[in-house]
Regions:
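Conserved nucleotide-sensing/catalytic segment adjacent to the nucleotide-binding pocket
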Residues: 92-95, 150-210
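Pre-Walker A adenine-sensing motif
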Residues: 108-115
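Glycine-rich phosphate-binding P-loop
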Residues: 125-142
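A glycine- and Lys/Arg-enriched "phosphate-lid" helix/loop adjacent to the NTP-binding pocket
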Residues: 2-7, 90, 194-212, 220-272
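Loop/turn-to-beta-strand initiation segments
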Residues: 120-121, 178-181, 224-228, 287
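Charged, amphipathic alpha-helical linker segments immediately N-terminal to NTP-binding catalytic cores
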Residues: 2-6, 37-104
Length: 317
């Protein structure tokens, strides 16, 4: 039976002193190693009784990604250099607009069903190098979707408050509830990408984060959230053309940031970081999808098809 302290409790002075010492030690440990969502996720998964397999009633079986998209096989290495960023998945540019319109209509209708059922949530993650097309993809693919059921989050440099928490805190706060679609424009993967390339944290810190991210995503999955992760893959030459276009067109000047030129010098370092993140964090429950993104019209259709097919599986599960 648990010991009670206070007026009607027992517990000697020495017991209380021991409890106080233990409490102080525990508090010190929390300061040195503050609790995190990822740590809680690991404990929750261990006690869920569902590991290692997923609960079928919580996680629908999703169809393969659209043709042209390369899905990273869990446990396998990946090299972006070996993936053609100009691939179109057999799409014809002349038919792309009609194809995109059709997929957007599907997403709009299926999102309403997802919202009405409130059984699952969808989290769509977009990562890419600068000028990779995250904003354009989100804008073109999700045009017409009811904003009451879809929220886009663009993550910038962490605030002072966010830096006082564990690295996953700000992302978990913005994950979608059941019936909703959440979109991450950049995401928790920045904490194993830009922080690695820029040396913002020790190597041992960012290396440990791969496993913490997998635990975090597994927790979301076990809670009924389907995670679609898209990496928009462009070539170095394509990035150069897009940066030059931003400088040449006054209407695109707002997109240009001189820091982009500095980041471009770290192209190879970013490619290595991308390869590692894609390989280490592509799991059976949240695989990475590499989207050839040099051709924007093909990119949009491939992403739209994959989202539409996934939401269809969710509402029919």
């Amino acid at each position: 039976m648990a010991r009670k302290n206070g007026k009607d409790g027992s517990g000697s002075a020495s017991d209380k002193g021991g409890d106080k010492a233990a409490e102080t030690k525990s508090q010190a440990g929390w300061r040195d190693h503050p609790p995190s969502f990822a740590g809680w996720a690991r404990a929750a998964i261990a006690g869920s009784g569902t590991a290692p397999s997923l609960s079928p009633h919580l996680h629908p079986v999703l169809p393969p990604a659209a043709p042209g998209i390369v899905t990273v096989e869990p446990g396998r290495s990946v090299s972006l250099a070996a993936i053609d960023p100009d691939a179109t998945g057999g799409l014809d540019k002349a038919e792309a607009k009609a194809a995109l319109d059709a997929q957007r209509a599907r997403i709009k209708h299926l999102q309403e069903m997802l919202y009405a059922e409130r059984r699952h949530a969808l989290l769509v993650v977009f990562q890419a190098i600068d000028t990779g097309g995250k904003d354009g993809t989100i804008r073109n693919v999700l045009e017409g979707v009811n904003p009451q059921g879809c929220r886009v989050w663009s993550f910038k440099v962490p605030s002072a408050e966010e830096l006082d928490q564990d690295f996953l805190w700000r992302y978990h706060l913005r994950t979608p509830g059941r019936g909703l679609i959440g979109v991450f424009n950049r995401s928790h993967y920045e904490d194993v990408l830009v922080v690695r390339v820029k040396g913002l944290v020790p190597e041992e810190t960012w290396r440990e984060r791969y496993g913490l991210i997998n635990d975090f995503e597994r927790l979301l999955t076990l809670s009924g959230t389907v995670i679609l992760k898209f990496f928009l893959h462009i070539s170095k030459d394509e990035q150069k053309e897009r940066l030059e276009a931003r400088l040449a067109d006054p209407e695109k000047h707002w997109k240009f940031d001189p820091a982009d030129l500095v980041e471009r010098k770290a192209w190879d370092a970013y490619q290595t970081a991308f390869d590692d993140a894609l390989a280490r964090c592509s799991t059976p429950y949240a695989p990475w999808h590499v989207v050839p993104a040099n051709r924007k019209w093909a990119r949009n259709v491939m992403v739209a098809k994959t989202i539409a097919s996934s939401v269809s599986a969710m509402v029919l599960a």
